[in-house]
């Protein structure tokens, strides 16, 4: 898990610029899905509760098996906003201390193309 905000800023800038270059509509609100994973369900659940308290919508946790047979638990926290780099980076900055507190990995964010 990288907690370097400069890396997340660069990745966010690249994603937003690619979506806009592909013709995604800059005037619409987008559902931004932030992805999280942890091998310890209890810690993941605590992080989800704290993210909810911080104002994010959270999805139910899912169990996944990795290629090596290990089990991890995952969930998303969602927000709605325009494709605004500063807004998305501010949300990441708000989330990272919560994730660090519980040892939960931040696996980046995504959204869908909109015309």
From Swiss-Prot:
Gene3D superfamilies attached to this UniProt entry: RraB-like
Record SUPFAM superfamilies: Hypothetical protein VC0424 (SSF89946)
Cross-referenced InterPro entries: RraB, RraB-like_sf, RraB_dom
GO molecular function: endoribonuclease inhibitor activity; enzyme binding
Main location: cytoplasm
GO cellular component: a single term: cytoplasm
Pfam family, one: RraB
Cellular localization per UniProt: Cytoplasm
Domain of life: Bacteria
UniProt keywords, alphabetically: Cytoplasm
Transmembrane region(s): none
Function recorded in the entry: Globally modulates RNA abundance by binding to RNase E (Rne) and regulating its endonucleolytic activity. Can modulate Rne action in a substrate-dependent manner by altering the composition of the degradosome.
Self-association state and partner proteins as the record states: Interacts with the C-terminal region of Rne.
UniProt-listed NCBIfam families: PRK11191.1
Family per similarity comment: Belongs to the RraB family.
Protein name stated in the entry: Regulator of ribonuclease activity B
Organism: Aeromonas hydrophila subsp. hydrophila (strain ATCC 7966 / DSM 30187 / BCRC 13018 / CCUG 14551 / JCM 1027 / KCTC 2358 / NCIMB 9240 / NCTC 8049)
